[in-house]
Every structure is written in structure tokens, then in C-alpha cells.
Amino acid sequence: MDSINNKSIRVAVIGASGYGGIQSIRLLKEHPDFEISFLGGYKTAGLKWNDLCPFLPLENDPTINAVDLSEITDKSDIVLLSLPNGISSQLTPKLIKEKVRVVDLSADYRYRSLEEWKSIYSVESSKHSRKDELLCSQAVYGIPEWNSIEISKAKIVACPGCFPTASLLPLMPFLKQGIIETDGIIIDSKSGTSGGGRVPKEHLLLAESSESVEPYSVVGHRHTSEIEQELSNLSGSNIQIQFTPHLVPMVRGLLSTVYARLRDPCLTAEDCKTVLETVYRSCPSVEIQPVGVYPKTKWVRFTNKALISVQVDQRNGRVILMSAIDNLIKGQAGQAIQSLNLMSGLPTCKGLPLIGYYP
């Protein structure tokens, strides 16, 4: 397997051929401390990796294995799951029982309540029986900038979705400190087509998505409840938001613009920038822009960086927060590697790209 003698932490990747799995393997391949010890899949089992992904060759051209519990537990210290919603929960309880720690890219453990997951992911719930309420309550929501201690001790880390990542990072400092009102929060997000995954979908075809911007799931997008859960837990009150995602004609990148009412309308953009800088001063993956400089998705492509900017409209007392991330890295695989680092006693951003390529 793609190992180097001084790599000491064995990581199995299950669901290796999707976008999340591919990004994870690329980051693990370049990481100085992690060894890719097992590649697993369902539909791709038996295929050679370099045939499936010739653009990302691995040493010794490993075969993607069937998902065999005993082999996974024998060969890994931590398992990174990049499986469709509903499927991760069929494997995770067995891994935890064998004392193997799990980082999960799906939504299966993002909710503290299994019943809430079932109501939001009703289609998946109808296909996959679950009785892992306790694991749902024990899973740590994987925002490393906020939950680093909990992640370091976790048996299972539930990686946030890409929209929640880009929305929560700018919002949480203001909500935590009571600087904004808890009602009337609006989030407008725009994401590239890779956010829809690698499985072919008609609306993601070039002829359908090119030269067009479209809103979708305007009411009831699945990430709405995920964002609300985290904001409510942080504030101690029930928070409802208005969240509208948009599909834009680019492959990768995500931009969220968040609107909230200031409790003190006299606060300036510089005041709000200071709030962000104070909270994230020790977080290499988060960079606060000068007032008047607004983040672009191009600036964060292929990086684990979140660029955040703030402005205040003093006419109406609103703060406007802008956040740009690469949806496949900071919004998915890179954030998972941050959790792997913390679980392994390593610096949070070790082995992760923080400087992009321009243009």
C-alpha cells in the first residue's frame, strides 16, 4: 500500500472513489504521518486504484477491497468513511465496537437525535434500519476551530456539510458573544457543481449548468436544520434561519453571505473584524480579510483555508459576513484531515495546503 517507513498512523478510506474519497486520498498521500492502509468500496471492489483514478496514482497500485470488517480493523487505527448518507451508519457501530475510531463525511452522525436524522433524511431512513441512538448522541460535530478538544478524544467525528462549514465559521463568534440577534438570520450560499457528488445527475451536466445560476431547495434544504442545530446549541435558544443555496457554473468553491441584526447598531465593521480576529487568531485555516476586501472562491481553490470578511450597513444595523471555502477541501476532505490530525495528537493543519494557486 502507499506507505512510507516513517508514516505511523494507519488510515483506512472506505468509499474511496467518490469526490470526498479522492480528495481525502490525495491529502493523505501527501501527509507525513498518515499511511493509507486500506482502500474499501462497494461498487468498485476488485478494481485496481490506478485504473480507476489514473490522475492520482498510488504506489504499488492497490486493489480496492470489499468492505470486510475484520480486515479493516486489522489494518487501520482510524477509518475515514466517504459513503452515501445512510450507509455509513451500517458500518460505524461495528467499527466502534472493535475500538476503531471513525471520521465520517456523511450526514449520518451530524444530528444529536437519530429521530431528527430520520425526519430530515427520510429516503435514506426508509432504506437503512438504524438503532444507534447512543452513537448519535456521542458523536462530535467536527468543526476543529471550535471543537478541537472534543475531537481529539472522540470515537466518532461527524464532519459538517460544506454549506454549514462556510456559514457557521463566520456566524459563531457573533452568536457566542451575543453580538447579534438570534432571529432574522439569512444565509445566501453559492456552490460549484462538485457539491453534487460524482454520481451523474442531469442538472449537473455541462449543457444544463453552464452559463446559468439557479437557486434550489429554497425551503427545506437538508443543511438548514444542521446549521440551526449548531447555532441553537451554541446560543442556548431555538434558532431558525432562512437559508437559500444556489448552483453556480464552476467546479469547486463555495461562497456564503450571511446577514444578521446587530444588538448594538453603533458597532463598526472594524469592531466586528476585531471579534473575528480574536476568535480565530490561533486557527491557521481561517483568515480574516481587511474591511473592504471581500473573499473570492478563486483565492481558496485547492486549499483548506476559509477566507472571511465583514461589513456593517449602519443604515439598518445589519452585519454582513462573507465566507469563501473550497467545498471539497475545507468543506469536506480537508476538514476531515484536520480531525484526523487532532485525533492523532498532531497539529490541526499538519499536511494541509493553506496557499492556493492563482489565477
Swiss-Prot record:
Places the protein is found: Cytoplasm
Keyword NADP included in the entry's annotation? yes
| PROSITE patterns reported in the protein's UniProt record | ARGC
What is this enzyme's catalytic activity, as reactions? N-acetyl-L-glutamate 5-semialdehyde + phosphate + NADP(+) = N-acetyl-L-glutamyl 5-phosphate + NADPH + H(+)
Q: Pathway, according to UniProt?
A: Amino-acid biosynthesis; L-arginine biosynthesis; N(2)-acetyl-L-ornithine from L-glutamate: step 3/4
Listed GO MF terms: N-acetyl-gamma-glutamyl-phosphate reductase activity; NAD binding; NADP+ binding
Q: Which domain of life is it from?
A: Bacteria
Query: What is the name of the protein in this document?
Result: N-acetyl-gamma-glutamyl-phosphate reductase
Q: To which species is this protein native?
A: Prochlorococcus marinus (strain SARG / CCMP1375 / SS120)
Tell me the name of the encoding gene.
argC
